[in-house]
UniProtKB/Swiss-Prot annotation:
The keyword Ribonucleoprotein applies. GO terms for cellular component: cytoplasm; small ribosomal subunit. Signal peptide: none annotated. Protein S19 forms a complex with S13 that binds strongly to the 16S ribosomal RNA. InterPro entries: Ribosomal_uS19 (IPR002222), Ribosomal_uS19_bac-type (IPR005732), Ribosomal_uS19_CS (IPR020934), Ribosomal_uS19_SF (IPR023575). The keyword NAD does not apply. It comes from the Bacteria. HAMAP family: Ribosomal_uS19 (MF_00531). This is Small ribosomal subunit protein uS19. The gene is rpsS. Keywords: Ribonucleoprotein, Ribosomal protein, RNA-binding, rRNA-binding. PANTHER family: RIBOSOMAL PROTEIN S19P FAMILY MEMBER, SMALL RIBOSOMAL SUBUNIT PROTEIN US19M. Gene3D superfamilies: 30s Ribosomal Protein S19, Chain A. GO terms for molecular function: rRNA binding; structural constituent of ribosome.
Length: 92
């Protein structure tokens, strides 16, 4: 379900503060965040965020195509190890 337009995008308050500090300092360090539910805003373009996936912080460099999406979309939480192969083809 899509969020109502009149509510506006959700962004964690601490995330906005961290982004403002990073922009003001001009440093290009990875900003560690745990808020996967926050929406990516245009003011985040050019910054790199470390989005927590439950084990580690995955670095995500924000570009213009990502605006409007959620941070969690770019930090997968599960690893796919593949399906088991056909046992008959392995034997022969």
């Amino acid at each position: 379900m899509v969020r109502s337009v009149w509510k506006g995008p959700f962004v964690e308050g601490s995330l906005l503060k961290k982004a403002d500090v990073a922009r003001a300092s001009g440093r290009h360090d990875v900003i560690k965040i745990w808020s996967r539910r926050s929406t990516i805003l245009p003011q985040f373009v050019g910054l790199t965020f470390g989005v927590y996936n439950g084990q580690k912080h995955v670095p995500v460099a924000i570009n213009e195509e990502m605006v409007g999406h959620k941070f969690g979309e770019f930090s997968p939480t599960r690893t796919f190890h593949g399906h088991s192969g056909d046992k008959k083809s392995k034997k022969g």
